[in-house]
Regions:
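Short beta-strand/loop motif that positions the catalytic acidic residue
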Residues: 241, 247-249, 253
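Alpha/beta-hydrolase-fold enzymes
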Residues: 131-215
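An N-terminal hydrophobic leader/cap segment in hydrolases
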Residues: 1-31, 35-42
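Short alpha-helix in the alpha/beta-hydrolase fold that links the catalytic acid
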Residues: 243, 257-266
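Active-site glycine-rich loops that stabilize anionic/oxyanionic intermediates
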Residues: 56-60, 127, 251
Length: 309
């Protein structure tokens, strides 16, 4: 269960971050449109700020928890969610899950939590979760800061080739997915067949763990989900005014090149910042990048919480 799965991922962190991540989160459940959504939580009622961690394709809350734990020293109330198809969330119709449902779920979760808790909320999105965090902030207006390891815009012609194993030119990949969708959209295939799970980390052992984890990279996704992502039109960055955005992109990412995310970020007219995590792969665990990530998170959480630190 991913309530303990974070321990396996924490083993790949250098100290002191490995020890920091051993604090046990607890499981919470939320009913949403006939689904039981699972979350990991470290509740700190007296904390001045909240953080919600959002995984991407092939991830889950346990995989992200060691990254979330980087902020636990900073007196933060932390949650990581399992989106449908991943983790322990109970999905009644796996073949029908589409990217837009992920956006809707997260927006409603943010609104539901905000109605009961008015502390500032920071969204931390990893991989595909970066664009989810961005879109949720744009749609809800209830987010103090967006932190993303990746901002891969499917409208960018280079994005599908970076996302998938299919080295098809330009928009050929999306056209193929649209052609397949009416008859094969519900067909579920292992995510590692479609995406570069082998490039998840610079450490082959960590990449192998991610690719075979039945709660994450070892799960199956419907082809229609991938089609729904490449066809999804996010809020144009030129129109984004919801919150400051910090891109914390691994500098040595072999899966999604940093320049794709940077050129999206630079179209945002408001406050934005790029922090390149030196020596880090797509799943950042290496020094000195992990220390750079921890430092960026400390500064963002302190500012969002109004502590002035």
């Amino acid at each position: 269960m991913n309530a303990q799965a974070h321990r396996a991922y924490a083993e790949f962190l250098p100290e002191p971050y490995r020890s920091d991540s051993v604090a046990e989160p607890v499981s919470e459940w939320w009913e949403w449109r006939g689904r039981r959504v699972h979350m990991l939580r470290a509740a700190v009622p007296e904390a001045p700020v909240r953080i919600l961690a959002i995984h991407g394709a092939g991830g889950h809350s346990g995989l992200l928890w060691p990254a979330v734990a980087l902020g636990l020293r900073e007196n933060v109330d932390a949650t990581a969610v399992d989106l449908p198809l991943y983790g322990r969330t109970i999905e009644p119709d796996p073949g029908g899950v589409r990217y837009g449902q992920w956006v809707d779920l997260l927006c409603e979760l943010v609104h539901a939590r905000a109605a009961a808790d008015d502390r500032p909320l920071v969204l931390f999105g990893a991989s595909m979760g970066g664009m989810l965090a961005y879109e949720v902030a744009a749609r809800t207006g209830a987010v103090a800061h967006v932190v993303a390891t990746c901002l891969l815009d499917p409208a960018d012609p280079a994005a599908p080739a970076a996302l998938t194993r299919w080295n098809l030119p330009g928009r050929s990949g999306p056209r193929l997915l649209r052609w397949i969708d009416p008859v094969g959209g519900r067909l579920r295939v292992p995510i590692r067949w479609i995406t570069h799970m082998d490039k998840m980390s610079l450490d082959p052992e960590l990449s192998r763990l991610c690719a075979t984890d039945p709660l994450g990279g070892g799960a199956r996704i419907p082809l229609g989900f991938l089609r729904s992502f490449v066809d999804y039109r996010h809020t144009p960055p030129e129109d984004f005014t919801a919150a400051p955005v910090t891109l914390v992109h691994p500098a040595a990412d072999q899966w999604t090149p940093p320049e794709l995310s940077i050129r999206f970020l630079e179209r945002i007219p408001g406050r934005r910042e790029t922090v390149l995590l030196d020596n880090c792969g797509h799943f950042p665990v290496e020094e000195p990048g992990i220390a750079q990530l921890a430092g960026a998170m400390r500064a963002i959480l302190a500012e969002a919480g109004g502590s002035g630190r």
